[in-house]
Structures are given as C-alpha cells and as structure tokens.
C-alpha cells in the first residue's frame, strides 16, 4: 500500500471543494501523492488511487468531472464533494448515485464523502423571497465545511485505505 500512487483531482467553483481537497490530500499517508485542479486535461500523473472532488449543481457534478471519471480504467476511485443545499444524508446519497454511474465497471469504487458548502451571497439574495427554512439552510451553510466536516474527510480517507488494506 505504501507504494500506491494517489492523485487528488478536483473542480471547485467557490473554494469549498478546494478546501476539502487540500484536507483530503493532507490526510493521505505517505509521499506518493499529488493534488491538482481538474481543468479538462487528461494527462494527469497516472495513479493507482484517485480521490475525485466536485461541486454540485442541479444534483450532479460538472461536465469536466463526469468526463474524467468516465476516462479512468482499472483504478481505485473515491469521490468527495460539496453542495450548498441541505445537510441531508439522503440528498448526499442521491448526489453520489448520480455521479458514480459515470465510473466504468473495471474500476473499483471506494465510496464518497459529501458535505455542505457555503454559497455565493447572490444565492442568499435570491432566497430572501423563499421560505424561512431555506434562509436558515444558507446561514448554516456559511459555517461549512467546518472542523467536523474536515475531520470527517480525514476519517473517509482512512476508511478508503482500510478497504484497500483488507483486499491485499
């Protein structure tokens, strides 16, 4: 496992996913690792294990992330992402399901970590005419990703490596 090359690739629109990506990168054991912004290129340093990060819009990830996921073959893949809406495990599972279908069957899917992320102030202005629950959700999102979210990301990395270790 120590010789396993790990790559963290992410797409971030507002900085939330970037924050998570850096935390996940730091939590990966060893030195055989790299982190890069996913910007549409496909010639990233080839790795054995990929942590692929995304922001969400309308229940899925950006085209760049989905295209890259579809291009990977014979790799171990873990997903991570942020979304402004709801701190809801059910919604996060739906997001995961919507995105993981782009991963080809010859890859080993290792799970996903998704947490709430802060939204642009323009979203709050749009919410002013909506229900109080949406305003409350925005206000809660301003505190995320928080220390607990980042710690949970570290735990997720540990769980991924434990899954790999059990297979060996």
Predicted regions and their residues:
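N-terminal beta1-alpha1 ligand-phosphate binding loop
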Residues: 5-27
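Secondary-structure boundary/capping motif
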Residues: 4-5, 47
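A short, aromatic/hydrophobic, helix- or strand-capping loop or linear motif
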Residues: 37
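Basic/polar N-terminal segments that are highly enriched at the extreme N-terminus
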Residues: 1-4, 168
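Short amphipathic alpha-helix with an adjacent loop that forms part of the alpha/beta core around
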Residues: 40-45
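FMN-binding flavodoxin-like domain, especially the glycine-rich phosphate-binding loop
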Residues: 26-34, 47-52, 56-168
């Amino acid at each position: 496992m120590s010789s396993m090359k790990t790559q963290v690739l992410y797409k971030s629109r507002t900085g939330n996913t970037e924050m998570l990506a850096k935390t996940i990168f730091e939590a990966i054991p060893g030195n055989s690792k790299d982190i890069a912004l996913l910007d549409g290129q496909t010639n990233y340093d080839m790795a054995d294990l990929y942590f692929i990060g995304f922001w969400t819009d309308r229940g899925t990830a950006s085209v760049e992330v989905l295209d890259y996921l579809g291009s990977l073959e014979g790799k171990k893949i873990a997903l991570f992402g942020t979304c402004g809406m709801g701190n809801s495990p059910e919604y996060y599972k739906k997001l995961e399901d919507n995105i993981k279908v782009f991963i080809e069957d010859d890859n080993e899917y290792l799970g996903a970590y998704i947490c709430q992320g802060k939204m642009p102030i323009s979203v709050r202005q749009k919410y002013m005419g909506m229900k109080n629950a949406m305003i409350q959700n925005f206000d809660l999102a301003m505190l995320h990703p928080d220390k607990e979210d980042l710690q949970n990301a570290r735990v997720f990395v540990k769980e991924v490596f434990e899954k790999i270790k059990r297979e060996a």
